[in-house]
Amino acid sequence: IRDRLRSTNSLWASYKIIEGLTIKETISYDFIDNQSTTYWPMNSNNGEAYNGLMIKYPYQHHNIYSSTVLNYTNTFADKHNLDVLLGWDVDDRKEQFVQAVGANYPHDKLPELGNTSEPMTASSGYSEDHLLSLLSRINYDYDDKYYISANYRRDGSSRLGAVSYTHL
């Protein structure tokens, strides 16, 4: 038996602050709930040696992403074009699971872990990580002939330790 639910949602809004300056916010949420149960009956190839065998594996995943971007564009004296972007992204992820295995069931009609006389293994796990990014870009051109561009991005990740994330 496998029940799986996945929900992916995204929402964005943009607002013109003044002429040439806009802000855009994007928020996304991804959720997975997976409930997996496998039972091999007593007379099956996999279950015969264990007098019935069951594995349960519930798993959940949460991911929240947010992006905020300020963008400024302007043309000066009909020949100087400027485009400046400043933004930051936040990405938070959490996952958790439990796995339990049981064997030696009294009857095939009672395939629940609480009915086993021989719990074999149980394990669980939890992970969480965060990513924070700062980004910027400046584009300039003169009369659509001469271009210059500069970009900067800095990422801080909890996967690389507290110093990487907090000293962004």
Task: Identify what each model region corresponds to.
Residues 1, 37-54, 94-122:
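Surface-exposed loop/turn segments flanking beta-strands in extracellular/periplasmic regions
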Residues 18-19, 107-110, 157:
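Generic secondary-structure boundary/loop-capping signal
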Residues 83-89:
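Extended hydrophobic secondary-structure segments that form protein cores and membrane-embedded regions
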Residues 158-163:
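Solvent-exposed loop/turn segments connecting transmembrane beta-strands
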Residues 166-167:
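Conserved small/polar residues in nucleotide/adenosyl-binding loops
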